[in-house]
Amino acid sequence: SGSGLEQIRAAGISVDGPVLEQEAKALNPGFVKSMTVGLPFVRCKLAMSLDGRTAMASGESKWITGPEARDQVQQLRAGSGAIITGIETVLADDPGLDARSELVCEQPLRVIIDSRLRISNDAKILNLPGDVIIATAVSSKELLADKQKMIGNENVTLYSCANADGQVNLEQLLRMLVSEKQCHD
């Protein structure tokens, strides 16, 4: 509850502190942020070439980072509660969004932002072990039930959370990840 020091002092015990408060908070930024504001600590992974592009002019996607950067991404994935991507990445690359590291004890939750439920029922991400959440703006219970049945995987959850513009409500999604899935980062 954050009142431990005051309780000890109230009991008449002399306490020096807080000590190294910022250093302690830096050890677990996800937990601290989720406990203070109800949102996870979000890391964004981007890569671009020196000319500011993320793909070749033809639209073909190539690795533009070196092995060290790719290893660092895997370490970040291994330490994350969830990995989030958009439907365009899923449609273009058919990723698994898994953490490929010896540090992985349990795969992170995979989350796809797909406002209109365009994901293919045979997308790789839907057929790997582990839980997947598809965040959508679709609110029709009938459409959601039909899509869930077509996907046919009990580890996949459709989560409806539309904003006023008919897109996925990112804040609502992030708050749900903290409150229901204990994803702090």
Language model features with spans:
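Zn2+-dependent cytidine deaminase-like catalytic core
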Residues: 1-23, 109, 138, 142
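Proteins enriched for Cys/Gly/acidic motifs involved in redox and nucleic-acid/cofactor modification
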Residues: 5, 19-49
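Short acidic/polar active-site loop segments enriched in Thr and Asp
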Residues: 183-185
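Active-site ligand-binding patch in enzyme domains
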Residues: 33-34, 43-50, 54-181
